[in-house]
Amino acid sequence: MRPVAKADVGGSLGLTPWQVLHAVARGYVLAGQGMGRGLAEHWLSLKYCEALHGNRAGAMDLTDKGRTAERWYKSMQARELAVGFGLAAAEHIVRKRYPDHIVSVVDTSTILRAGWALGGAQRDKGSRPRPDFLIEAWKPGEPSKVTFVVCRGNHQKPSKRSGRTRSTTIQQLVKGAELAEGMQIGEWNSTPCLMLSTELMGQGGVVVNALQAPGEVRLPLRIPGAPGNADVEIDGKSGIPYPNAIRIPAREGRRARNVDGFQVGENDLAWFGQLLARTGAAGLTAFAGGGQNTAQYLTKHQGREHYDVPTFAATSSSHDAEIAVGGRKFVGTDHVFRMETVRIEAFSGMDADLYGLISEGHVEEYRRAAYELRSTLPSAEESRKWSGPISFHEDGTVMALSILPVRRRNAL
């Protein structure tokens, strides 16, 4: 492990609180396998609408409302906001490494359910270690590159004497390395990893600490229209071995040995590439409304049955809302909630043309179109015309808030 080089970061990372919540939502959109029928999983990010702001130094910081003393809330806040800040930083780093690519985030557990058992027979031993997320950097006509990501967070405060962080961040980074080692793609130790620990009460504001393990994994190139492309439905491979599955070669005087882990073998790389692309497509459709458009991309063990049912706006996420920004139409789902006395409408969705492609099962065509449209996202000036915070991502997704007019009920 080593610190992330300044060249990989490219200076400071400019973020708004709403972009962080957009990242939280995208990270959790498939995490519950669609079982949160009353409220789509990605709306959990909304409870942090008043938790972040810019401080006097221009850095992101917790608001007074975000600095709660409740231990259970702090634990949840550290876990979930760490996903937002960690993924935002990780995506930024991966974009710097592959500047002409689009990056997609997929929950690792959702991927692994297609072929592996996530827990052992002895339940007291807990779940098997693995990274939290996979970031796929992709460009039509080129092999995809995969990076493991582990996100952790804490509320530790820097030492008043030295300003240095205490042991919690170091422990989280070390634990992140252990989790990342629990999965291998192709040859041992070839997949790059990013371990991130977010200090929500760091010196001067929110601080994201990052370590990396170098490497590069390239998945086999898929040819649109040819066998093995991402439009083709795939089956899960349940029963892929976990015990002694990872082969560690002889090194530094130690003999070669096998250890437990999630191993994607050389012969499974093409299948894994399809699985990654299709699960990513499931996440996009779930973000825009879920339902059967999501189910088509998941295997049985990934939770397909939870989406393969009729959807109704009152009981689940439904793709029946739309907005227009900068001359572009976005379709998706919405949710109304309150912040004190103000009624707020949250919208999550996708560019209408891109959603049309992906809802019809055209993953490869979606990727070509998204790549061509990535530079045409609404500008900052166009975004300011929206009546509230709004965040766009190059994969075509959008998340926005708007204040609803006061609604008065007539007396009965």
Question: Where do the PLM segments sit?
Answer:
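Acidic-basic catalytic patches of nuclease active cores, encompassing PD-(D/E)XK
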Residues: T68-G119, A180-P192, L284-T285
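Nuclease-adjacent, charged terminal/linker segments that flank catalytic cores
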Residues: M1-A57, A282, A286-L412
